[in-house]
Amino acid sequence: MNIFPAIDLINGKCVRLEKGDFNKTTTYELEPKDVAKAYQQAGAEFIHVVDLDGAKKGQTCQFETIQKIRENCNMTLQVGGGVKDFETIEKLLEIGVDRVVIGSLAVKDIALTKKFFEKYGAEKIVLALDVFIKNGVPYIATHGWQESSTTTLDEILQTYLGDGLEYVLCTDISRDGMLQGPNFELYRIYSSIYPDVQFMASGGVGSLEDLEILKEQNTYGVIIGKALYENKFTLQEALEC
């Protein structure tokens, strides 16, 4: 299983939100580029960066910070937050981003998102599908989790399978930033229904036991954020799982 340490950015600083709530923000006095370098030195091969300002505004804006992260590490770098157009994707790829994460746009503008797959290839595109569970069904939440939709996770996955959909980062927003364990059932079920899709688990990881369960379920990858900042375990320990 691939470990993706996460860096969430607001105004150039590392932060964590609780349940995606911009009013419940913890800011860490750490330089993002230094955090990235430390992750690489610990042995990480992947890193996940989110421009939360971009997610909220609907336009990626922290290019300079992202570029500094790129210059300080050679890990596979995936970046999301407000990616809405070709220009933004071009700029991110230009500064060395390996995979671009498409969030609410994948629900709001399917035609444009399909064009991204066509132009850049499925290996460059990660769909970030944030879900809330209602009556046992995962529905999509959009726009930095500030809106909820009536679209189900299944509907979106089916929409993009024909485009070669390869990577899906799926977050149960009720778990995010809570350190109370991810939604194991969600990843287990969807990994078995869609064996050709590489699912990245996100939200709620708070212990090494959580990682071991996800690994046993053959989850492709897991995003780890707050657990590292709060020293629940070290990145080395996570990588050794």
Swiss-Prot record:
The record's subcellular location field reads: Cytoplasm
Instruction: Give the catalysed reaction(s), semicolon-separated.
Output: 1-(5-phospho-beta-D-ribosyl)-5-[(5-phospho-beta-D-ribosylamino)methylideneamino]imidazole-4-carboxamide = 5-[(5-phospho-1-deoxy-D-ribulos-1-ylimino)methylamino]-1-(5-phospho-beta-D-ribosyl)imidazole-4-carboxamide
Q: Name the catalytic site residues.
A: 8, 130
Q: Which InterPro entries does the entry link to?
A: Aldolase_TIM, His_biosynth, HisA_bact_arch, Isoase_HisA-like, Isoase_HisA-like_bact, RibuloseP-bd_barrel
The source's domain of life comes to Bacteria
| Annotated GO biological process | L-histidine biosynthetic process; L-tryptophan biosynthetic process
Name the pathway.
Answer: Amino-acid biosynthesis; L-histidine biosynthesis; L-histidine from 5-phospho-alpha-D-ribose 1-diphosphate: step 4/9
**Gene Ontology CC:** cytoplasm
Q: Which UniProt keywords apply?
A: Amino-acid biosynthesis, Cytoplasm, Histidine biosynthesis, Isomerase
List its EC numbers: 5.3.1.16
GO molecular function ontology, one term from the record: 1-(5-phosphoribosyl)-5-[(5-phosphoribosylamino)methylideneamino]imidazole-4-carboxamide isomerase activity
Family matches, as HAMAP family: HisA
UniProt family annotation: Belongs to the HisA/HisF family.
Question: What is the name of the protein in this document?
Answer: 1-(5-phosphoribosyl)-5-[(5-phosphoribosylamino)methylideneamino] imidazole-4-carboxamide isomerase
Organism annotation:
Francisella philomiragia subsp. philomiragia (strain ATCC 25017 / CCUG 19701 / FSC 153 / O#319-036)
